[in-house]
Amino acid sequence: FVSLHTLPAGTSRVPIEVFMAKFYKDKALENTYELPDWTKPLQVGAALTRERVARDTDFEGDNISAKNVNYCELTALYWLWKNRLQKEGAGGYYGLFHYRRILDLCDADVLRLEENGIDAVLSYPTLHEPDILEHHARYIKDADWEAMLRALRELQPEYYNALKHIGLQPYFYNYNMLIARHEVLKDYC
């Protein structure tokens, strides 16, 4: 893995917009921190409450906000895909953070993105022994996992076959956090 911090910085900043998922029941943070101007709070599960904790919500435009209890921060990713990445002329970088989990990037790191042709920035992988499949078995209901496997087998059989190999690995990238070039994130979604 290459650390973004070690790459040469560029001289021009590309457009970047990273949405930080916030939920109305989030616990208060013990310490506050200043967010970069390119990080925008986005309330997830906004369809489930009248309480507002952010100006922007996943309940605007094309959304699955009401399904937040099942999909957590993925309702933010869906909203981003349908309401930002589909816009004509959209470019630059987009991403997703959590209210208490962010990638440690400074302004110089943002300058490194375009200069070095970076497609995506991810967190460091998390180790789970003995493998990813056993980790998921502890946290995902069997019926939900089986439904996902059926859908994957039907809609993306090549990914279904890859999952068998990937699932036996001891590490994965947690929390659906990333920053990616517009087209890369759009393809991912």
Question: Residues of each region from the PLM?
Answer:
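ER/Golgi luminal nucleotide-sugar-dependent glycosyltransferases, focusing on the catalytic module
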Residues: F1-C189
